[in-house]
Amino acid sequence: MRDKGKLLMFFLIGSEAFFFIALIIAYVYYRNITHATDTVTANLNVPRAAVLTCCLVLSSGSLMWSKKAFLKNKTTHFKLGMSITLILSTVFMGGQIIEYIELYKKQITLDKDIFGSSFFTLTGFHSLHVIIGIIAIGILFSFSFIKFKNLIKNAISAVEVYWHFVDVVWLFVFFFVYIKPLL
Amino acid sequence: MNWETNNIHIIRELFVYFLVVATIILGLVIFFTIFYGWKYRRRPNAETPTQDHGSKRFEILMIGIAFTITSVFFVLTVNGMNQIQNIPDNPIPDIIITGHMWWWEAEYRTDSIITANEIHIPANKKVLVQFNSDDVIHSWWIPKLGRKMDLVPGYDNYMWLQADEGEYWGTCSEFCGAQHALMRIHIIADSEDDFKIWKSSQLKPPPATQNPLFETGKRLFQEKTCISCHSVNIHDKEPVIGPNLAHFASRKYFLSNIELNTTENLYAWIKNPPAVKPNTQMPFLALTDKEVNALVYYIKTLR
Amino acid sequence: MSLFVNIAEPDKTLPSIKNDKDRLSWLSSVDHKQIGIMYLLLSLFFFILGGLEAMIIRWQLAVPENDFVSADFYNQIFTMHGTTMIFLVLTPGLIGLGVYLIPLMIGANEMAFPRLNAFSFWVTCFGGLLLYFSFFAGGAPTAGWFSYAPLSEKPYSPTTGIDYYILGLLLTGIGSIGAALNFVVTVLTLRLPGIKLTMLPLFVWMTFINAFLILGAFPLLNAGLVMLLIDRQLDALFFLPSSGGSAILWQHFFWSFGHPEVYILILPAFGIISEVIPVFSRKPIYGYVFVAASTVAIALLSFGVWAHHMFAVGMTNTVNGFFAASSFLIGIPTGVKVINWIGTMYKGSIQLTVAMTFALVFLINFTIGGLSGVSFAIVPIDWQLTDSYYVVAHIHYVFLGGSAFSIFAGIYYWFPKFCGRHLSEKLGQWHLWLFVTGFNMTFLLQHILGILGMPRRINTYLDLPYFESLNMISTAGAFLMFAGVAVFLYNLIITMRSKPTATPDPWDGWTLEWATASPPPLKNFDTLPEVHSRRPLWDLKNPDNKDKRLN
C-alpha cells in the first residue's frame, strides 16, 4: 500500500497552493492598480528579508538531513537536524515579528491602506503556516526524547513535505513582495 | 437612424438563432428519451439485450457536429458583441449616470445639468452614457432597449443608448440592498424639439412665487437640514446623499419612480419617510402638519 | 491478503437508530456508511429548511406589490435559500452518497482516513448550524449567496449576518476539502487489487475527478472569504472601492470558485445517472471512455469560464470573447454525456422504476438547463438576460432539474442498499410526478419572465402585462413540489417502519456494492469477486458472455 499520509499531504498542499495563489494575486493586483504602494514598499527591509529567506531555505535542508538520519537510525543526528530546523524557523518568525513592529511604528497597518491590507494578510497567512509547521516539528522533536520508537516515517515525511511547501510559498512571497518592486 | 446597430435588435436576432437551434436539440433529446423509453420498455420474458459498449466513430461525429454549431455561434457572438460594445478609446460621455442606494443621478456633461431619476434623452440618437456608482454595485437594465451595464464603484463603464420616442422603464438589476426592487429606471426619449425644450426649462431658474407658504417652506428647507442632503441648484454636484431637487416639480414620478409626484404622495413621504420606503436614508424628522405643508408647497414650486 | 484496512471497531452489524444504546454511537462513529447516512440526513434537513424558504419567496412573489414579508426579511430569506441549497443540501448530499458508496464500489472496507471523514462531516454540520444561528444573532445575511462586495462590507451590511455567512462557509468549505482529500486518497490507495483507474464505476470516477475540483476551487472561495472577514472585522480595505480596494476582485475570486462549484454539484450527479441508466436498460454505458474523458475535460475547462458570470461588469471585448469561447467549449463534453446516456437506452430493455424515471426526467430537464446555459455564452444575450429571472430559471434547471433529480434517482436506486428496504414505488411515482410537474410549472415560465424584463432578487414587482399570471403559476408549481417532497418524506417514514426485506442485489446490478448484504455489515464485504472488467458482477452472472478483460 502506498504512503497514504504523504499522499494526503501532497493533495492538501496542492489545495493550499490555490489559497496562496489567490492571496498573491490580490497583492499583485492591488500593487498594480494603486500608486501608493510603491512609496510604501520603500519601507520594507529587503536585506533582512533576504537573510530570513536563507534561514527558511536552510531549515528545509536541515529537515531533509534529519529525516535521512532518522531512516539510518542515527538518533543524535536526527535530534541535531530537528533542533537546527526549529532554531532557523524561530529566527524566521522573529524576523517577521520585528518587520511587523517596524511597520506599525511607521503607521503602516492593516487598516491604513490597501498595501497594508494585502501585505499583512499575505505574510500573516504564511506566518500562520510557519507556526503550524514549527508546532508539528516541535511535536516530532519532543517525541524523539519521550518515545522515539513511536516516531514513524510517515509522520516525518508528511511534515517534511509540508515544510518544503511553506518554504516554496515564502520564495514566491519574497519575490512578489520584496524583489518585484525593486526590479 | 441605423437600426442594425441598435442593441436590442442584435440581441433579439441572436436569441432567435439560439432559440431555433436549442429547440431542435431539446426536441431531439425529448423525442429520443421518450421514444426509446417506450419502444425498448421491458417486456415480460425479455431477453438480455446485446451488450453494446459504444462506437468511437459515432462519438467523434457527434463531437464534430457540436463543435461546428458552437463555432458558428462563437462567430455570431463576437460579431454581435463588437457591434454593441464599440466604445471609442477616450470616450467623452453625453450623460453620466451614477447609481446611489437607491436612486439614479444623471449629469448632462455639456450643460452641466444634474438631475435625478427622470432621465431625458434625445430620441433616435446614439447617446454615450458613462456609468459609475457611489456606493455598491447597481446594474442598469431597460429590457426594451437591450443590454445591461453594471454600475461599479471605482470603475467607469460606457454604453451606447438609443431609443425611439417614448417612455421606457427598467429596474436595477444587480442586488443592491433593501430597496433593490424599488430602484426603478425611467427614461424619456424626447423628439429633438421636446428635448431642447426640456433642457432649456431645466436651465431656467424656477418661476418666482410670492406666497407666505413659499417663504416658510424655503426657510424650513434650510432649517430642517433638508439642504444638507438635497441641493436645489441644477448645477450642484454636492451634496450627493439625496437627489438634486432642482426642477423637482417637473418630474412625473419621485422616489426612484415608484410614486406619482402628487401633493398627497409627497406629503405622506415627507411626513414619515420610513413608512413609505423602509430602510430609506431620509430620516423621520417629526415635522408638524403645517411644516410639511409648507415644505410640499415649496418643493412643488420648483418647476 | 491485505484487502482490508484495519479499523478499531469490532465486527458487528451496523447500529440502528431504533436501538437506544447505539444512538450515541452515531455521534462518535467513523464508519463511512454511518457518516454517509448522516451526510444525507443533514442534506435532507437543510433541504426542508431551504424548501420552506423557497415557499416564502414564492408566496411573496405570487402577486404584484405583495407585502407578505418585509424587503429586509425577503433578502435574508433568498440569501439563505441559495446558500443553503448549494452549500448545505447539494454539496453534502453528493458527498454523502460518495462517502457511503465509494468504498463499497471499489471493494474497500473504509475510507482512507475514517477520522478525517467524521471531522469533515461534523465541520460541515457545524458550519450549517452556525449559518442558521445568524437568524438569532441579529438577522441572517442579506447580500445574496454570492455576497457581492461592497454590499457585503460593513458600511452597507452592518449586521453580523455576513460574518456568520463567512464563518459558516469557511467551515463547510473546510469540510468539503477534507472530504475531497479523503476521496482522492481512498480511490488512489484502497481499490481492490485488479481495479485499475480506467476500470472504476463512473460514479466513483466522477466523484474522484470532482474531488480535484473541490481541492482547487474551495481554497479560492476561502481566500476571498478570509479577505472579506478581515475587511469586516479588522477594517482592512480589500473590497472597499472608496478606500482603494476593488469591487471586482471579489467577483473574480467568487466566480473562479463559483463556476467550478457548479460542476462540483453536477459531476457526481452525472455519475449517478451513469450508474442508474445502464442498470435499468440492461446495457453497459454507451462510450465509457468518452463519458469518463468528457468529465476530465469539464473539470479542466471549468476553471477557465468563471468570468461569464461577469459579462455585464464592463470587461473588454477581448476578455469577453475568451470567456465566451471557453464557455461554448465546456458545453461540448456535457452534450457528449447526454448523447451517451441516450445511446445507452438504445436497444436496451428499459425498466421504468422510480429511479430510472428520475434519470430520464433528469435527461430532459438538465438539457433545458444546459441549453439555457449555453445562451449565456452568447455575450449579447447574456448582457440582456443576466441577473434576470431567466438566470433563476437556468440555475434551477441545472441544480434542481440536474443535481437534485439525480440525487433522487440515486436515493431510490441505492435505498435498499442503505437501509435494507425498498422505498415504495407507488409513493415514489407520486413524489416524482408531483415534483416534476411542479418543477416545470415553477421554472419553465420563469424563462419568459426574464425575457419580459423581471430582474432577479426583487421582493416586489409592478403589475406589468403577464407578470402576475406567470408568477402565480410559478407559485402554484412550488406548492406541487412541496406536496411532492411531503410524499417523499412520508415514503421515507413508512419505509423505515417496515421490515427489512431487500436482497443484496435487488436491481440485478453490476458494481461491487451489490456484492454484499443490504445494508452492508460493518466491514462491508465477506468475500469479494475478482475484478477483471468494469462490471464485475455482470461477469459473475454471465460467465459465457463476459465483458472484455481489462487487467
Language-model-detected regions and their locations in the chain:
Chain B
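The canonical Cys-X-X-Cys-His
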Residues: 172, 217, 223-233, 266, ...
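Extracytoplasmic/periplasmic beta-strand context in beta-sandwich domains
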Residues: 138, 183-186, 218, 241-243, ...
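Electrostatic cytochrome c docking/interface patches
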Residues: 111-115, 193-222
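Membrane-embedded segments
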Residues: 93, 99-107, 114-191
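Extracytoplasmic electron-transfer domains, predominantly the class I c-type cytochrome c fold
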Residues: 200-212, 236-303
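Extracytoplasmic entry segments of secretory-pathway proteins
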Residues: 1-125, 206-207
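Secreted/processed peptides and extracellular or luminal domains of membrane proteins
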Residues: 178, 232-235
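Signature tryptophan residues that serve as conserved aromatic anchors
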Residues: 102-104, 195-198, 269
